[in-house]
Amino acid sequence: MKLLTVLLFLLAYLDAKVYYAKVEPYEIRDISSNVSGLVISADETLVGQTLSQKQYIKIDSELDEKEQIAVREKLMYIKNTIEINEAVLLNLDELLAKKRENYKKIEPLKFKSSVEKDREFYDLITSENLYLNTKKEIQNLKIQMSDLKLKDAQLQRTISDKNLVAKDFVLYEMLVKSGQVVGVSTPLAKVADVSKAKLTIYLDEEDVVNAQKKVLYIDGVKSSYKISRLLNIADSKNISKYMAQIIIDSPALFSKLLKLELKDE
């Protein structure tokens, strides 16, 4: 009985596929500039550290910030002007209602001269034109406000793009220095998501079937991890191999080489 158990164990061991994989961050992002400008600060001492809400790269945004203040002041003034004009419009609406009513009353009166009637008519038309002009001015101001809101949003995005933040990511590499002028698409930094880790292996064609159901052993120890991603398209570099990835908990130390075995149990 013991001999049978040993034989079964040896068969399972021989049947297991052995791979080696480096523990890598879950994601490494290449950060490029969305704007042009002068780099004010790029703190290389942050490399290897987990970043906070504070910017790790700052591109000069002084003029953008001043312009945004001016735009927001204009928005406030236009908003106040619209409110005043809308109050004027209400008054003009009431005035027009009275003038229309008065004109309807005097128009059929025979003892009123045509000159008096014309005067009332011209006064009514003038008031109606004033009402329409005020309404038109409100519409124009609202268009200006809409344009300024768009400008404010664009400036806010530019300012954000010039103050780079990557909270909870690790600064993997700094690619610019303070005093450097950058343009759109200039590489700035690399940041890593270390909240999880990944192991990448390349399977032979015959190993792809049921690979996600296999039991994974890491450095000889059975784990609860399974293959998380499996491509059914052969890798462009590792010819006739199929990439598989295992997502694992974040380790204390990355870049270690681990031995992986895929077994039936």
Regions found by a protein language model. Give the residues of each.
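Extended, EK/Q-rich alpha-helical coiled-coil segments that serve as long dimerization/scaffolding arms
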Residues: 102-128
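Long, charged alpha-helical "stalk" segments
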Residues: 31-34, 46-108, 134-149
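Short hydrophobic beta/alpha edge segments that flank linear recognition/processing sites
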Residues: 43, 47-72, 156, 160, ...
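Extended amphipathic alpha-helical segments
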Residues: 73, 80, 122-166, 180
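Short histidine-centered loop motifs in beta-beta connectors
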Residues: 38-50, 169, 173-176
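Short beta-strand-turn/beta-hairpin segments enriched in glycine/proline and small hydrophobics
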Residues: 17-41, 149-168, 190-191, 228-236
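Sec-dependent N-terminal signal peptides
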Residues: 3-13
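Hydrophobic alpha-helical membrane-insertion signals
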Residues: 18-20, 168, 175-178, 184-187, ...
